[in-house]
Swiss-Prot record:
It comes from Chloroherpeton thalassium (strain ATCC 35110 / GB-78). The keyword Metal-binding applies. It catalyses: dUTP + H2O = dUMP + diphosphate + H(+). Substrate binds at R65, S66, G67, N78, T82, I83, D84, K92. CDD domains: trimeric_dUTPase. Pfam families: dUTPase (PF00692). This is Deoxyuridine 5'-triphosphate nucleotidohydrolase. Disulfide bonds: none annotated. Keywords: Hydrolase, Magnesium, Metal-binding, Nucleotide metabolism.
Length: 147
């Protein structure tokens, strides 16, 4: 098991926590002095009061919570959001409200999930041509069309 160092930037911040033994993601909670309203069809940047030290070769991915998406149409517009190993600032979550009504985020609300993932570095090699495949340049729904 790898270790992620986590620094509380606010005394009331809540450390990331797995809700169940089999959970892939840790719950991330809002750290607020007062509630934030995410207006309908708008976004809000929600602080967590936490900073992370992720080991080299890993990233943290922030993902939506399924219950917020299902019940309130609250999601993350850049999911999965990548937190790089060399970032040391406050972890903040961009929430988007796809619903028709404003959504209130209160201190301690679980607003996202965080998954730690291994990252492989690659070398980009410029070439004059690419190898041929059956699919070729077909994209954007190409494989979903019956012909």
């Amino acid at each position: 098991m790898i270790r992620i160092h986590c620094k509380k930037l606010h005394p009331e911040a809540r450390l990331p926590k797995y809700a169940t033994e089999g959970a892939a993601g840790m719950d991330i909670s809002a750290c607020l002095d007062e509630p934030i309203s995410v207006e309908a069809q708008s976004v809000a940047l929600v602080p967590t009061g936490l900073a992370l030290e992720i080991p080299p070769g890993y990233e943290a991915q922030l993902r939506p919570r399924s219950g917020l998406a299902l019940k309130h149409l609250i999601s993350l517009p850049n999911a999965p959001a990548t937190i790089d190993a060399d970032f040391r600032g406050e972890l903040k979550v961009i929430l988007i409200n796809h619903g028709k009504d404003a959504f209130e985020v209160k201190h301690g609300d679980r607003i996202a999930q965080m998954v730690i993932a291994k990252v492989e570095k690659v070398a980009v090699v410029e070439v004059a041509a690419l190898s041929e495949t059956k699919r070729g340049e077909g994209g954007f729904g190409h494989t979903g069309v019956e012909g």
